[in-house]
C-alpha cells in the first residue's frame, strides 16, 4: 500500500502516516519508508497527538476535523491510516505523491 492513495468511491484520500510527536513545528516531512512522515508539536499523551494531527490535517485539506476518519493505528506511531473525504485542497507535498 502506498503512503498516499486516491480513492474514487467514496472520493477521498487515504494516508498511511508515521507520526513524530513533540516536534518543533507542525509539518509534512516527507516519505519515511512506505509512510508519509508528519511532525506535530503535541505530546503523545492521552490522545493529544491524534487530536492535534486531525486538527492539522483538517487545516491542510480544508475539511472539518470531524470528517477525517482514523481507520487504524490509534495507539501507534507507525501504520496510522486515515481517510480524508472530499478534500477541498490537496497540499503540494501530498499532490506530488499521488
Curated annotation (Swiss-Prot):
InterPro entries: DUF167 (IPR003746), YggU-like_sf (IPR036591). Pfam families: DUF167 (PF02594). GO terms for cellular component: cytoplasm. Belongs to the UPF0235 family. This is UPF0235 protein APJL_1398.
